[in-house]
Amino acid sequence: MAKVVITLVKSPIGYEKSQRATVVALGFKKGKRVVEKEATPQINGMINKISHLLKVEYK
């Protein structure tokens, strides 16, 4: 399975509660962090939901 490197580039403050919860579910604890995940359909759906807050690189 492919890896995805996700960087949080914008704060979720001021966005819907569900979008903030998605940021936490992806593993971001503080702003401007980087996480690496497997590219599963569930992770891709979360990325699509908050794509305006993220920078995404596929490996």
Swiss-Prot record:
One MF term in the entry's GO annotations: structural constituent of ribosome
Domain of life: Bacteria
GO annotation, cellular component aspect: cytosolic large ribosomal subunit
Pfam families per UniProt: Ribosomal_L30
CDD domains (alphabetical): Ribosomal_L30
Keywords: Ribonucleoprotein, Ribosomal protein
Gene Ontology terms: biological process: translation
Family the entry assigns: Belongs to the universal ribosomal protein uL30 family.
Subunit comment: Part of the 50S ribosomal subunit.
Protein name: Large ribosomal subunit protein uL30
